[in-house]
């Protein structure tokens, strides 16, 4: 079986993971203590558990997950929470002092002490897998542990597991709302370090998800749990075809093959539909056509950028539940007639479909309604460069005055690393611009010779 190991780094990574595992357990019929519910026992025994769970001799299902944070508070909540008996206690690794929003502490000083222990635990989980497919790494770009320790971990995973897929789910700093002043520094430093080590990075930004929760779920003041449960639905959709049957299955390597035209351009934009509250669910038709169209509206996308200003290179549509291939193909045919959805000229077809027959689950008493079908769209678009440019601007404003730089240098970082990281990001923005420019000219020139 193709197993996937989840590694959750820092506060954001660990809290998103809590929502994800809560959802996986509901989907697979696993109780908070790790044992199957009675009705699930009566069904087909092999229900695709083994991708995310390993089964012990006495029938307990243990997540293939590792929690690591440089300070204990967030992981302690898992250790004492409703799912404390689900996770292996040794797979929760915490330090004594946090990274204080400082990339250099997470990557160099404090992180260095913890990394070998974490890799040792990863090795133990990996040895338990028959055919390890890859890693999902959850972390934020703005925090100290998420950015610094996350980057260190990606570097070390590349050394130890070079051939395995490494997919990241990153919480990207929102354009308007910031949790710390030095987010632009941390984000650009971690992007620079992980650019060559990550195969595919799915970015979500808090502001975009706040807006989706406010608009679609009618929550005036969404909290992190509301946001994380929405992100969990996306992660579940992306991994559903690894766990359940479907007519068009997609595995981790296929994501890269279909979404990443060049190694550096690996930041797909994520959208999910329908996000709908229980109160409104009964009044909506929620047809395949409607769902598919709504994924292309900027309002439903999980990073603040406008895809109408960019061009698409590739798009994956992952359907779940009561969807027949015919409807999906019809929806895509309609999309292709739309003038607003522009593809780069060197990739005219650009749509990859996945269908998984397992209907989406919802958390009891949660905000999301129970729906019979859903779609998650992953699209590689040049518009995501907008997100980078707004971040670069903030970085430049601070770095021109060398503000806060001494905190990083004091933790053993070279000051030159800032300029190096900034140049790398400028190169990434240029890469996106080049991809968007029409490439027909070169071919015509070649044809003349």
Swiss-Prot record:
Q: Which Pfam families match?
A: Tubulin, Tubulin_C
Q: Which residues bind Mg(2+)?
A: 71
Q: Which EC number applies?
A: 3.6.5.-
Required cofactors, per record? Mg(2+)
Q: Which GO MF term does the entry hold, naming one?
A: metal ion binding
The protein's site described by Involved in polymerization is found at 449
Protein task: Tubulin is the major constituent of microtubules, a cylinder consisting of laterally associated linear protofilaments composed of alpha- and beta-tubulin heterodimers. Microtubules grow by the addition of GTP-tubulin dimers to the microtubule end, where a stabilizing cap forms. Below the cap, tubulin dimers are in GDP-bound state, owing to GTPase activity of alpha-tubulin.
The name under which this protein is listed is Tubulin alpha chain
Natural source organism:
Gibberella zeae (strain ATCC MYA-4620 / CBS 123657 / FGSC 9075 / NRRL 31084 / PH-1) (Wheat head blight fungus)
Its taxonomic placement starts with: Eukaryota, Fungi, Dikarya, Ascomycota, Pezizomycotina
The gene name on file is TUB1
